[in-house]
Amino acid sequence: MSIELFHVISDAGSAEVRRFVVDHELESAVRFRNLHYPEVQADFARHQGSVPPAVWDGERLFQGAQACIARLSALSDVGRAS
């Protein structure tokens, strides 16, 4: 599964999600996509993105810091004992 995090460097919500990825050691599972770049903006628009940060999981776009963290939490819970 390829997870993409669309983010803005200067945005507080984006920083919160980037920190979550690092704190939960998800760097190998999440591709950071900086919305500063036109090609990243085009991909974001193709997924109907309008609010950073946003996580694309290959099927659905999750927008806003809390929605992103909720989606990424599912990745960090994989393999843990119940």
Predicted regions: what is each one?
Residues 1-31, 37:
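Local sequence-structure signature of Cys/Sec-based thiol-disulfide redox active-site neighborhoods
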Residues 1-2, 80-82:
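N-terminal leader/targeting and pre-domain segments
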Residues 26-27, 49-50, 58-59:
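Short glycine/proline-enriched coil/turn segments at helix->beta-strand junctions
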Residues 31-50, 78:
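Thioredoxin-like thiol-disulfide oxidoreductase module
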